[in-house]
UniProtKB/Swiss-Prot annotation:
Family annotation (Pfam families): Cpn60_TCP1 (PF00118)
Catalyzed reactions per annotation: ATP + H2O = ADP + phosphate + H(+)
Transmembrane segments: none
Keywords in alphabetical order: ATP-binding, Chaperone, Cytoplasm, Hydrolase, Nucleotide-binding, Stress response
This enzyme's EC code(s): 3.6.4.-
Gene behind the chain: thsA
Protein name from the UniProt record: Thermosome subunit alpha
Subunit and interaction comment: Forms a heterooligomeric complex of two stacked nine-membered rings; one of alpha and the other of beta subunits. Sometimes called a 'rosettasome'.
Subcellular location(s) per record: Cytoplasm
Organism of this sequence: Saccharolobus shibatae (strain ATCC 51178 / DSM 5389 / JCM 8931 / NBRC 15437 / B12) (Sulfolobus shibatae)
Annotated coiled-coil segments of the chain: none
Skewed-composition ranges (Basic and acidic residues): 535-547
Amino acid sequence: MASPVLLLKEGTSRTTGRDALRNNILAAKTLAEMLRSSLGPKGLDKMLIDSFGDVTITNDGATIVKDMEIQHPAAKLLVEAAKAQDAEVGDGTTSAVVLAGALLEKAESLLDQNIHPTIIIEGYKKAYTKALELLPQLGTRIDIRDLNSSVARDTLRKIAFTTLASKFIAEGAELNKIIDMVIDAIVNVAEPLPNGGYNVSLDLIKIDKKKGGSIEDSVLVKGLVLDKEVVHPGMPRRVTKAKIAVLDAALEVEKPEISAKISITSPEQIKAFLDEESKYLKDMVDKLASIGANVVICQKGIDDIAQHFLAKKGILAVRRVKRSDIEKLEKALGARIISSIKDATPDDLGYAELVEERRVGNDKMVFIEGAKNLKAVNILLRGSNDMALDEAERSINDALHALRNILLEPVILPGGGAIELELAMKLREYARSVGGKEQLAIEAFADALEEIPMILAETAGLEAISALMDLRARHAKGLTNTGVDVIGGKIVDDVYALNIIEPIRVKAQVLKSATEAATAILKIDDLIAAAPLKSEKKGGEGSKEESGGEGGAGTPSLGD
C-alpha cells in the first residue's frame, strides 16, 4: 500500500470548490450588509472603538472599512475595493462595497442553478463594459469654462450639496458656509485643461482643525495656517511683505555625533565656552538677517539664545513645524528649503504679503496670507468637539474630491438611484441580445444595481419593494431621471430639479471597483489557510477550528 503524501504543513486547513466559494461570498456579503445602512443622506452612523478605546463615529464608508480590523481574506478584497474607490475619486466607497455584495449575492443564486463561475464572471464583465458605454449617453455635459460664473458655481453647489448632505455635519447656514468654502478653495487651485475641464491639485488645499466655536466659525484662508505660535515674546506679531526662510535645520548648537567630553578647569573657560556658543548662534541669525529674511519658519528647534538674537533683529520665528507643512510652505511661498544656514542665499527665501499671529479659540496660530503662489489655500475648521471636527474634515475631503471629479470630467448623472435604475433597464435589453447563460449573469448584474435605489428608499422610510416597482414603472414610461428624494421621503420624477446629482467619474469608479472585487472573489475555488503562528495560538481567542485558520476556511470571521 502506498504511503500518504504530506503536501501541506501540519495544521493547514483547506476548503475547496463550491464550499470555498460560498464561504468567501458569505464573508463579503456580511461586510456589505454592515455598510448597507450607512448609504445615502439618511444613512446611519457606525461607532467604531479601537483596541486603545478611541471612539470614531462616522457613516463614511472608507473610514468604516479602514478602521474595522477585518480578518477574512475575501472580505479584505472588498476593503481593498473601497480603498481603491477612495484613492481614485474620494467618494462612493459605501456604494462600491454594497454593490459588490449585491453582485455576489446574485451570483450565489446563479451558482445554485449550476451555472459555472467563469460564465458568471464573463457575463458581469460584459455588463460592466456596456454600463460604462451607457453612462456618458445618460449623463449631461455641463459648461464650466468660467468657474466664477453664476451658472458654474450653481452646478458646483449642487454637487457639493449632494456629497455633504449624506454626511450630516451641518444644516442651513452652516452647510451653506461649508459649501461656499469648498467651492472657493477648489476654484482657487483649478488649472484649465484642453478638454474644457480643469486639473485640481488637492495637495494645495490644507485642512486644519481647531476645537471651539461652531462649524459656522470656520474660515478659508488664501495662504496657509500653522498651528504654532511665535516663539519669543519680544518678536513682532505681524510682518507685512514677509521674506520667509523655511528651514529644516535646527537653530541650535549641534551635538557632536561621537561621544565627547569637555574638560573645564577654570571659570574663564566656562565663560569662553558659553561666549563661543552664543557667537555660533549669533552668526547663524546674522546670516539669515543678511539675506533679507524677516520671518523664519523652522522644522526643528530654535535655541533660547537664538530666539533672543532673532527678536533683537525684529525677525518673527516659528519652530517645530510639521514636515508636511514645511513642504506645503515651500510650494506656496516659492521658497527653497534651507538645510545649511551658512550656504543660504536670498534666492532661497519665499514671499508672502502678511505673516501674523492670531488668537483662535484659546490658542494662537500663525496665518500666512498673500503667498507668492496664490493657488495655496487653507480651510480652518471650528467645531464643538474632536469627533464633530473629524467628521467635518472627512465630509469636506469627500466634497473636494467630488468637485475635483466634476472639473476633470464635466459630466453629471442623476442621483437618488435614478442612474442605477436606468442602467438596469438598458442592461436587461442588452441581455436579450446576448446568447447563452451569460444572459442570466447580465440580468443578475442589472438586479444588483437595483439594490442601491432600494436601500435609499428604505433609509427614506419607504417600503423598498413598492418603491422599486414604482421606479421601474416610471422609467419604463421614459422618465429617465426618476429617483428617490431621500430627504423628502418620496419618489420624484426629476432628481435634477432637487439638485440630486453625481459626477460621472464617481459612478464609473463604483462600477469598476465593485465588479473587480466581485469577479476576483468568484474566481477563487480553493482556500488554503496556514496554521497560525505559535504566538498567535497562545494570545488569540478561541482555536484555529473556531476562527477557520486566518479568518479563512471556517465560519466567516470579519474581525476579532
